[in-house]
Amino acid sequence: MFLLDHDRAGGYWGAVYTFCAVKGLQVVIDGPVGCENLPVTSVLHYTDGLPPHELPIVVTGLGDAELGREGTEGAMSRAWKTLDPLLPSVVVTGSIAEMIGGGVTPQGTNLQRFLARTIDEDQWQCADRAMTWLFTEYGMTKGRMPGERMRPDGAKPRVNILGPMYGAFNMASDLHEIRRLVEGIGAEVNMVFPLGTHLSEVRNLVNADVNVVMYREFGRNLAEILGKPYLQAPIGLESTTKFLRSLGELLGLDPEPFIEREKHATLKPLWDLWRSVTQDFFATASFGICATETYARGIKAYLEGDLGLPCAFAVARKAGEKTKSDEVRGLIRQTRPLVVFGSINEKIYLAETKAGHGPAASFVPASFPGAAIRRATGTPFMGYMGSVYLLQEICNGLFDALFNILPLASEMDSAAATPATLRRDMPWDADAQAALDRIVSQHPVLTRISAAKSLRDAAEKAALDQGAERVVLEMVEALGDATMDRKGGN
């Protein structure tokens, strides 16, 4: 089966999400008719939950004439005239425009060109360059760093949060949590960049004492250029504590009082969940994750390292590296984790496993692509609040797995009539029983009883249908092969 499921977008998507997050900057997408449908309509309007016309975006809408004869300048001039001529504007090239040499800014406009390199860069690589470009173009003066405004005596230390932008999974909640942690130890947030920053304020990035980079996929290059110490936003219990202590050391603040308060307040539900009746399943509640490196690496370290839950697989989507989706699909089929964190791709692969015997795993959105709106700030993955939320999702996943075992009345009523009831005393060959045990062992411990009953009934029914007096190895192997075929789509 040929499999090529994309797990990221091209470069100009990352540029659009970066530039649209900045106030005072207008964006022109140089591309063919309909090129805005996916990055703008499906993501900004649906996933990010922004109404149409909320952001100053126009498209050149290249047709056959522009692509084959006239070029893109005329279309770009028409697009620019629909914008405010007094505000700065940037042209972002799509792959089609790049192939025909588009993106050339017409005379008499204030358009600046940003080459997205859509053909050879993904959205995260381009977003990293776009963040740096904003600072070098609007923060620096002729290549010189702006002067730093000294902090008044007695003022709180200042911290930048780099990376929040549109098109980033769970951004609102994680930004809210990182801001809460920074302010909790006594610092103040100097700027969140690029989200919500006005173009005239970009130069103020140099006024921070420390930078926090939200994502591993983009933002680190800008942090290097700013020349201040920077930390990676944390996921998990131990990681968050280390982050707060490192941040406190860099800023000259004592984070211990805040950490102690968090143990008795924010983290109280975590201790309760850990000591609740669900603890009986934690040692065998396996999980799998396929997400951006930020979340795949952080969630694995937390659930496996801090809590001791078995990790069936962890696949990180890294900037500039292709993810082997067929391998991810195979891992879900082979390891059968109880909870799967991922994108719409993994949700589809997980749905395929429902064709086999036994209950299906539960799915938790943890990455784009996928239709998951996360505008509310109550679903963090980062920080202490994220630690509580993730464990809560694991517990809910356990309950979902148990729910999937329950027989539905409609399914029971629709069962095909059988000429005879299954014989509970039907003998089994030893090798057939061993094969059944091997297949059942691939299921999570929590759901093995249900899977074993389902497989045993199917094997005995196959024996009765064939007029056999006992269950033999070939009957069980046929069930296993059929299950793999249905799950694999072969």
Curated annotation (Swiss-Prot):
Q: Write out the GO biological process terms.
A: bacteriochlorophyll biosynthetic process; photosynthesis
Keyword Iron in annotation? no
| Name the UniProt record assigns to this protein | Chlorophyllide reductase subunit Z
Gene that produces this protein: bchZ
Which InterPro entries does the entry mention?
BchZ, ChlB/BchB/BchZ, LI-POR_suB-like_C, Nase/OxRdtase_comp1, Protochlorophyllide_Rdtase
Q: How does it assemble?
A: Chlorophyllide reductase is composed of three subunits; BchX, BchY and BchZ. Forms a heterodimer of one BchY and one BchZ subunit.
Q: Is RNA-binding one of the keywords?
A: no
Bilayer-crossing regions: none
**MF-aspect GO terms:** oxidoreductase activity, acting on iron-sulfur proteins as donors
Q: Which family does it belong to?
A: Belongs to the ChlB/BchB/BchZ family.
Q: Which domain of life is it from?
A: Bacteria
Name the pathway it acts in. Answer: Porphyrin-containing compound metabolism; bacteriochlorophyll biosynthesis
Question: What function does this protein fulfil?
Answer: Converts chlorophylls (Chl) into bacteriochlorophylls (BChl) by reducing ring B of the tetrapyrrole.
E.C. numbers: 1.3.7.15
Alphabetical UniProt keywords? Bacteriochlorophyll biosynthesis, Chlorophyll biosynthesis, Oxidoreductase, Photosynthesis
Among CDD domains, the record links this protein to: Chlide_reductase_Z
- Which reaction is the catalytic activity of this chain? 3-deacetyl-3-vinylbacteriochlorophyllide a + 2 oxidized [2Fe-2S]-[ferredoxin] + ADP + phosphate = chlorophyllide a + 2 reduced [2Fe-2S]-[ferredoxin] + ATP + H2O + H(+); bacteriochlorophyllide a + 2 oxidized [2Fe-2S]-[ferredoxin] + ADP + phosphate = 3-acetyl-3-devinylchlorophyllide a + 2 reduced [2Fe-2S]-[ferredoxin] + ATP + H2O + H(+); 3-deacetyl-3-(1-hydroxyethyl)bacteriochlorophyllide a + 2 oxidized [2Fe-2S]-[ferredoxin] + ADP + phosphate = 3-devinyl-3-(1-hydroxyethyl)chlorophyllide a + 2 reduced [2Fe-2S]-[ferredoxin] + ATP + H2O + H(+)
